[in-house]
Amino acid sequence: MTRKNNDEIKFDHHHDGIDRRGFLKCMAWAGTGALCVIEGGVLKSYSLSNPFSMKRHAGRELSFVQISDSHTGFNKPANPDVVATLKAAVDKINALPVAPEFMLHTGDISHLSRPEEFDNVDQILKAARPKNVFFVPGEHDVLDDDGKTYRERYARNSMGAGWYSFDMKGVHFVGLVNVMNLKAGGLGTLGNEQLEWLEKDVKHLSKSTPVVLFAHIPLWTVYPEWGWGTADSAQALSYLKSFGSVTVLNGHIHQTMQKVEGNVTFHTATSTAFPQPKPGAAPSPGPMKVPAEQLRSLLGVTDVKYARGHHPLAVTDSTLE
């Protein structure tokens, strides 16, 4: 990796960890936030501390924000006040230089699927500048009644267990569900019915259409020993091989990770509630207690921008500090 100037980091493809299959993996800098743009297979990252890096990407045609893993109802030592940090996330969204047009919430809205937990999130999100919110469930949102309460609130017009798609300013968005019937430590699954629907959903699209998939559990294998992956994600992604630009946004692992494979950029978001250990750094995943003064540096939101005619989507991770 080589540093070109004070705000741009350009990856050297001879020394950046791309293996013979063309994978690129990078971890975002904890506590700083980074603006990542993929152009011609080159990943460029800009420090959020430099306002000029943000201005270069202002004025794009479509801007939206991803939040994840609010876990309202959680009150353990890893974060005894998840409501306060969710409110801080909304404040961060409202302070973005370009107002997002909508939000994606990639699941674990609640901690125990209780109505009052969903109520808290709904009330807090009303204060956000973007008023439209699109949800997919996390496993904590479907603990009871096979997810019926979740679907009645957030997915009334969806298919199956809550999957759906929509179009916005030339971008096709697909919300997927990979948390049903999840076993402890097991991989997520999409299932045949949802896969068949996805194949039909994208078949009619022009191959130049940018596609954004969003689901709770990563659609790439981050760490199978902890269930951080989706067993049948390869089948889903096979339907998108001929598209020029595919972005996959996930949550679940409570930390920012990114991988580029061919035409697909994978990105996982931090939580607004609590961090989890890095893969393999602890005996098991779960809420990780850190010194109170460090907590907000490990929580955050993700801002995504797209300009028509430009395939790369700019993905910005901001901490709650």
What are these regions (language model features)?
Residues 48-52, 56, 114-210, 232-247, ...:
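Extended active-site neighborhood of metal-dependent phosphoesterases/phosphodiesterases
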Residues 206-222:
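Short acidic, glycine-rich surface-loop motifs adjacent to enzyme active sites
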Residues 11-12, 26, 43-119:
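N-terminal active-site segment of His-dependent metallophosphoesterases
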Residues 19-42:
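N-terminal export leaders
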Residues 1-19:
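N-terminal secretory signal peptides
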Residues 74-76, 109-110, 179-190, 220-225:
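Surface-exposed cleft-lining segments at the edges of enzyme active sites
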Residues 67-68, 103-107, 134-139, 214-215, ...:
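Active-site neighborhood of phospho(di)ester-bond hydrolases with catalytic His/Asp-centered motifs
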Residues 177-178, 214-219, 251-253, 318:
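Short, well-ordered beta-to-alpha junction loops that form the rim of enzyme active sites
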